[in-house]
Design a protein with these regions (language model features):
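Glycan-recognition and catalytic cores of secretory/periplasmic carbohydrate-active enzymes
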Residues: 1-167
Length: 167
C-alpha cells in the first residue's frame, strides 16, 4: 500500500544529507513501493492520502515533474472525496471525507483522522505558488471549521479528534 511508500520516502528525505547511501536505498524502496501501489490501482481515500504525500516527498527529493504530477493528481482526487455539501438533512457539519469517490461510507479512523489535513498542509507549505494552493487551504479550513470544531463544541469535554492536537 501507499502507506509504505510514504514511510520509505520519509526515511529517504530525512537521511538525504547525512547518510546518502542509506537515503538512496530508501528512495529506491519508495519507488518500488510506488510502482507496486500504482499497479494495484487502489483509489480509496486512505490510499490517496498516502500516495499524495509519498509523491510529494519524492518530488521534494528529486524535483521530477512526474513526481509532482502524481502528487497533485492524487491530492486532488483526495479532495474529490471531501464532503462539501451538508448531508442527511442537517446543516451543521461537513468537510469530512468519503471512503472512496462515489462511496456512501465515510472515511473514519480512530487514530489518524486528520492525516488528510496533514497531507494538505504539506502541499500548502511545499507548493505555495501552485494554482491549487488556495483549494488546499479551503479544504483544511472546511474540515477545521465545520467538522473538527463542531464536534469539539458538542463534546462535553471540549475534545477534538485525536490528531488535531498533533497539527
Amino acid at each position: 500500500p501507499a502507506k509504505y511508500t510514504t514511510l520509505y520516502a520519509l526515511y529517504a528525505e530525512e537521511l538525504w544529507h547525512d547518510f546518502p547511501d542509506e537515503a538512496q536505498e530508501a528512495l529506491e524502496a519508495a519507488r518500488k513501493s510506488l510502482d507496486y501501489d500504482l499497479g494495484k490501482g487502489e483509489v480509496s481515500m486512505d490510499n490517496m492520502q498516502w500516495r499524495a504525500w509519498a509523491s510529494l516527498i519524492l518530488y521534494r527529493i528529486s524535483g521530477r515533474d512526474q513526481d509532482l504530477a502524481l502528487a497533485t493528481e492524487s491530492v486532488n482526487r483526495m479532495l474529490d472525496m471531501q464532503v462539501t455539501e451538508y448531508v442527511g438533512g442537517q446543516e451543521t457539519t461537513r468537510g469530512f471525507w468519503r471512503s472512496a469517490a462515489g462511496a456512501t461510507e465515510y472515511h473514519h479512523k480512530h487514530i489518524g483522522e486528520a492525516y488528510p489535513i496533514w497531507v494538505l498542509a504539506e502541499f500548502v507549505e511545499t507548493l505555495p505558488e501552485h494554482a491549487d494552493n488556495q483549494r488546499w487551504k479551503d479544504a483544511i479550513a472546511l474540515w477545521v471549521d465545520e467538522y473538527a470544531l463542531v464536534f469539539a463544541d458538542r463534546n462535553p469535554f471540549g475534545l477534538l479528534p485525536y490528531a488535531f492536537y498533533q497539527t
